[in-house]
From Swiss-Prot:
Record has Isomerase as a keyword: yes
GO molecular function, one term: peptidyl-prolyl cis-trans isomerase activity
Protein source organism: Echinococcus granulosus (Hydatid tapeworm)
Catalysed reactions, semicolon-separated: [protein]-peptidylproline (omega=180) = [protein]-peptidylproline (omega=0)
Compartments, as annotated in UniProt: Cytoplasm
Gene symbol of the encoding locus: CYP-1
Protein name per Swiss-Prot or TrEMBL: Peptidyl-prolyl cis-trans isomerase
Description of activity control: Binds cyclosporin A (CsA). CsA mediates some of its effects via an inhibitory action on PPIase.
Length: 162
């Protein structure tokens, strides 16, 4: 694992800590998209965007920096890009995976699993995992609900590459 990226998170306007992601080498196109959206080097990205959907015991979803509600976002390659491969599985909590609207519809939205979610294998591209900051993810999970609506705003206040 080569590339590492981070999110600094606030919950309800208060700093909640840092999540560090270790990204997998065998999904280079997916990793490069996430990395560039963390640094903002293309003029757009994750900084200042929120986690719009958090379901306890399942996952925390973010990455819609255009609409903020799960309908938007875009990749560095244009609007959408293909599923690179399904080498990695949703085999444990704290996996980082691409959200999508079906086959080959990756943009910028992603999710962090908080449980084993093996029914997503072969449908969503897993491209990294949480290396540190599991406690921050758990704090985020605590403000989620079964509908996915958060009781407090969960924001990426800063992000980048380490």
């Amino acid at each position: 694992m080569g590339v590492k990226c981070f999110f600094d998170i606030s919950i309800g306007g208060k700093p909640a800590g840092r999540i560090v992601f270790a990204l997998f080498d065998d999904v280079p196109k997916t990793v490069e998209n996430f990395r560039a959206l963390c640094t903002g080097e293309k003029g757009f990205g994750y900084k200042g965007s929120k986690f719009h959907r958090i379901i306890p015991g399942f996952m925390c979803q973010g990455g819609d920096f255009t609409a903020g509600n799960g309908t938007g976002g875009k990749s560095i390659y244009g609007s959408k890009f293909e599923d690179e491969n399904f080498n990695h599985k949703h085999s444990k909590p704290m996996m980082l995976s691409m959200a999508n609207a079906g086959k080959n519809t990756n943009g910028s939205q992603f999710f962090i699993t908080t449980a084993v979610t093996s029914w997503l294998d072969g449908k969503h591209v897993v491209f990294g995992e949480v290396e540190s900051g599991e406690d921050v993810v758990k704090d985020m999970e605590a403000v989620g609900s079964s509908s996915g609506k958060t009781s407090q705003e969960v924001l990426i206040t800063d992000c980048g590459q380490l």
